[in-house]
A protein has these predicted regions:
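Alpha-helical transmembrane segments and their immediate juxtamembrane cytosolic regions
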Residues: 1-258
Length: 258
């Protein structure tokens, strides 16, 4: 437990949060977000059948529909808090991994396995090219981190230009793939890596970027309380499995049960 003494002698206590704690928090809020999209919007409201105008008209005549739409929107806002945490943990994982290739391969395999569950739950189809899952964004971010690491000793104008070019390349790739969390995730990962030792600047920039998802800045409280402890009480493969499994289960519920 960290303690800070205020101007009037008041002692403020902040919790000690481990990597496991951050992972669990991110998974829970991501689950809430997916329930909001897959179950509420796709399964109960059938949002795709409405235009914005017809939806507004339907809600004005149906209080149940309005309530469901409101709940779905709130759940998606809650999910926005997961993005900064996942970005932060990705950078931490990159810095601490003993085998980058294995790390990237595991991420890529999870991305491939997750695509059909993602399309089913988020797009309402077994196969859809309109957007791709967030693990693809993380793979691109990992490659970006490796490129940044290769040129970390390059300083001055050349070093700065290389960093910018690598960042632009990553943004282009997530845009081509239309990957979930794309621009926000890439920018956050870049900030967390490049400004690692500048906690205040890193937090301010991260909060500004996270406003893309409205509630994102709230997650920085947990990141600020992170202790650096990475001992996994829960097997890391559980987290890899959680992403495609929760998408698959909610996708099946939304499309074949409701």
């Amino acid at each position: 437990m960290n303690m800070t003494t205020g101007r009037r002698g008041i002692v403020w206590k902040t919790p000690d949060i481990t990597a496991d704690g951050l992972k669990m928090f991110a998974c829970i809020v991501m689950l809430i977000q997916t329930v909001g999209i897959a179950v509420i919007e796709k399964g109960l409201i059938h949002l795709d059948q409405y235009t914005q105008e017809s939806l507004n008209q339907a809600m004005s005549q149906d209080s149940r529909l309005m309530t469901l739409a409101g709940i779905g929107s709130i759940m998606q806002l809650i999910g926005g808090m997961a993005i900064p945490v996942f970005a932060f943990l990705l950078v931490e994982g990159f810095r601490n991994t003993s085998d980058y290739k294995k790390y990237l391969i595991m991420m890529a395999v999870t991305a491939l396995v997750s695509e059909i569950p993602y399309d089913l739950s988020i797009c309402g189809k077994v196969w859809d090219f309109s957007s791709q899952n967030a693990m693809i964004t993380m793979c691109i971010c990992l490659i970006m981190l490796k490129c940044l690491d290769l040129f970390k000793e390059t300083s001055g104008f050349t070093g700065g230009m290389l960093k910018v070019l690598i960042l632009i390349a990553a943004i282009v790739w997530v845009s081509i793939f239309r990957a979930e969390y794309g621009l926000c995730m890439v920018l956050l990962v870049f900030v967390f890596y490049v400004f690692e030792s500048k906690n205040v600047l890193k937090t301010v920039l991260g909060c500004i970027i996270s406003l893309m998802y409205v509630t994102g800045p709230i997650a920085f409280y947990g990141i600020w309380c992170y202790t650096g402890e990475r001992k996994n009480r829960i097997n890391k493969y559980v987290y890899y499995a959680f992403y495609p499994l929760h998408l698959l289960v909610l996708g099946v519920i939304a499309n074949y049960i409701l």
